[in-house]
Design a protein with these regions (language model features):
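Walker B catalytic acidic pair
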Residues: 166-168
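Phosphate-coordinating catalytic segments in nucleotide- and nucleic-acid-processing enzymes
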Residues: 1-160, 229, 233-263
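Charge-dense, low-complexity intrinsically disordered segments
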Residues: 93, 171, 195
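C-terminal lobe/lid and adjacent interdomain/linker elements of RecA-like ASCE P-loop ATPase modules
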Residues: 179-263
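Walker B motif beta-strand of ABC-family P-loop ATPases
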Residues: 162-164
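Conserved D-loop-proximal element of ABC-family nucleotide-binding domains
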Residues: 173-174, 178
Length: 263
């Protein structure tokens, strides 16, 4: 990585499961591929905002089609996921079989699906109920699971794909954080996904750590610690010493404990 105080170019090298690498040079916030690049044939998804689901209404959707950002992509994928009902081919049937346990877990929280009503608005309806809820009225936590479940049901999340979760715990109740962490681990194991998770929550991190051990994916899991050294960002593999991450994440709580003890 580069330094804002330096005129030199920054660099990033991405290694994909020890098989292929991609080197980038970054100057003035613009990235350039250094070496010959390889073709990424699987889908890459980036989740950082469950409220993107609100943009499914026709008027807002058209307004948000302009631009080339991940949220616009997610809106397009969501709309196509609702319209496309042809995912019951042989390959998808095999995937669905692998995901039976995961879908069972999701159904305890997300008990319905998205539909387009007669007015062209997208709504959420639970199975066995005639009540329809406008998406803007769903809780932020439920939005997270609805988004996740819609992509899962439609086959958007395919075997071998790459998913980036940017602080997925932010909008979730602590109990739902545990469920979501479990679902992420189950999903990775079932579909052999490449998953990158960024979190500032020791609670969510611990949940991931526990479920990784429970579902036997420890060998394919790495933990990285992002910090600053000499005014430069460093991303360090601390898989053998995860306590370094917990120590940093728990430090604000320790400050509160110190204040309380001084009262």
């Amino acid at each position: 990585m580069g330094n804002l105080d330096s005129d030199g170019a920054g660099s990033v090298e991405l290694l994909f499961k020890n098989q292929a690498s991609l080197k980038l040079s970054i100057t003035s916030n613009k990235a350039k591929i250094v070496d010959d690049y390889f073709e990424i044939k699987k889908r890459i998804l980036y989740f950082d905002d469950p409220f993107v689901i609100n943009n499914l209404s026709n008027r807002l959707y058209k307004a948000n089609q302009v631009g080339n950002d991940h949220n616009s992509d997610n809106v397009s994928l969501l709309k196509n996921s609702i319209i496309d009902t042809s995912s019951a081919d042989i390959r998808q049937a095999i995937v669905n079989k692998k995901l039976e346990d995961l879908k069972s877990s999701i159904s305890t929280i997300c008990k319905g699906n998205l539909f387009e009503n007669e007015f062209g608005d997208y709504v959420y309806k639970e199975e066995g109920s005639d009540k329809a809820y406008f998406l803007k009225n769903l809780s932020s936590g439920l939005k997270t699971f609805v988004l996740f479940n819609t992509f899962l049901q439609s086959g958007v999340i395919e075997s071998g794909a790459t998913i980036i979760f940017d602080e997925p715990e932010i909008h979730l109740h602590p109990k739902w954080q545990l469920e979501f962490a479990k679902m992420i681990v189950q999903l990775q194991k079932a579909l052999n996904l490449n998953i990158l998770i960024n979190t500032h929550s020791p609670y969510f991190l611990y949940a991931l750590e526990v479920f990784v051990k429970k579902y036997g994916t420890l060998e394919s899991t790495r933990y990285y610690f992002a910090h600053i050294e000499d005014r430069c960002p460093v991303i360090e593999d601390v898989s053998s010493d995860i306590e370094r991450i917990y120590k940093t994440l728990f430090s604000p709580l320790q400050l509160l404990e110190n204040v309380r003890d001084s009262l």
